[in-house]
Amino acid sequence: MAAKVSSDPLVIGRVIGDVVDHFTSTVKMSVIYNSNNSIKHVYNGHELFPSAVTSTPRVEVHGGDMRSFFTLIMTDPDVPGPSDPYLREHLHWIVTDIPGTTDSSFGKEVVSYEMPRPNIGIHRFVFLLFKQKKRGQAMLSPPVVCRDGFNTRKFTQENELGLPVAAVFFNCQRETAARRR
């Protein structure tokens, strides 16, 4: 009998496996970039150019209620390149205490947004949303001192965040000078 092949884009894109363990999405999350007067929505596996993701995105949480709080992590598991990601993962952003039914601007930015700058190959940029047990739960224990070598699994375990409740990723690669014009 043939093994069942998953059609989940997070499995196909190896986000589940490389970054987090298998989970069931229970909250809807939207990630929207507004760079250079161009609005780009993030969909699993779609490609966005670095010039389209320069500014901090708006991440909307469509679930929970105002008494629920969420932690958002953005990471790149393909550093310095996808064929040899020995610096895996590179942390791009952490926002904690995001109230349900709001967006990331209502949370507490504990690691500032760093725009994607892929140098070698196609990188995956992953947004993960975790439900907190209470406000102020994710206190960066221990504090992040280096963005390279970040480990989402270890961070969520140390801060008792459990598995994600939502995730989305996009692909991004270095733009040629001709493309940026």
Swiss-Prot record:
The keyword Cytoplasm applies. Its main location: cytoplasm. Changing S35A: In strain: cv. 164 and cv. Snowman. May form homodimers in solution. Belongs to the phosphatidylethanolamine-binding protein family. This is Protein CENTRORADIALIS. GO terms for biological process: cell differentiation; flower development; negative regulation of flower development; vegetative to reproductive phase transition of meristem. GO terms for cellular component: cytoplasm; nucleus. Expression of CEN leads to a morphological switch between shoot growth and the development of flower structures (inflorescence). May form complexes with phosphorylated ligands by interfering with kinases and their effectors. The keyword Cytoplasm applies. Keywords: Cytoplasm, Developmental protein, Differentiation, Flowering. SUPFAM superfamilies: PEBP-like. It is found in: Cytoplasm.
